[in-house]
Design a protein with these regions (language model features):
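FIC/Doc superfamily catalytic core
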Residues: 1-213
Length: 213
């Protein structure tokens, strides 16, 4: 399971290690040839963080989010914590939160989560949180991997199976996220989030059938 998860979430971000190489690396400790240390650490860190989160039950917090991010990027990027400079997500064509307001927007997101965690279905709650996190883009690098790990944590914490965002469905995934961009940080209209929620629901079904059955 974890091999498929690590392969897909890192491949979405451009990691070129294929599934067989990922399996050999994580199961047998065999380092793939002609791959960068960054790509190798990327997979190893994902596996380590995933297993560490299975043992945790605490509520979302700035500390937990930063810890997940920093652990995912260990030996990859030395920049720790929320970013202090602006970024533009060119490939996705949207402007992230300006650096001076990252902490403020993350505060608002955590407050939104706390307010809605008892009145939204866990899949809907986790999906909307994931999107809003990605829209803020609070880190210099690793936002996608961190966001998908948080999505996984929120589902597992509520006794739901995790989701693979498959490499082959990357375009649909990113398109659904962009549709949801029309909602601001403290709101979540059904029209804006319907597609990404439906996408994640289908990915959950596919993950369950492909991995657990």
């Amino acid at each position: 399971f974890i091999i498929e998860f690590a392969f897909n979430t890192t491949s979405i971000e451009g990691n070129t290690i294929n599934l067989e190489q990922a399996r050999n690396l994580l199961s047998e400790g065999l380092t793939p040839k002609n791959k960068t240390l960054r790509e190798i650490y990327d997979l190893q860190n994902t596996e380590k963080v995933f297993f560490s989160l299975l043992e945790r039950t605490e509520e979302l917090s700035h500390e937990l989010i930063v810890q997940i991010h920093d652990s995912l990027l260990e030996n990859i990027d030395a920049r720790k914590g929320y970013r202090t400079t602006d970024v533009r997500v060119i490939k996705s064509n949207f402007d992230a939160t300006p650096a001076p307001y990252v902490k403020t927007d993350m505060d608002l997101l955590l407050k939104w989560f706390s307010k809605n965690k008892t009145n939204l279905h866990p899949l809907v709650l986790a999906t909307i949180f994931h999107h809003k996190f990605e829209k803020i883009h609070p880190f210099m690098d690793g936002n996608g991997r961190t966001g998908r790990m948080l999505l996984t944590y929120l589902l597992i914490k509520n006794s739901y199976p995790p989701i693979f965002i498959y490499k082959k469905t990357r375009v649909l995934y990113l398109s659904a996220l962009r549709i949801a961009d029309k909602s601001d940080l403290t709101k979540a209209s059904k029209e804006d989030y319907q597609q990404i929620v439906q996408f994640n629901a289908q990915e959950m079904i596919d993950t369950y059938w492909n991995i657990f059955l």
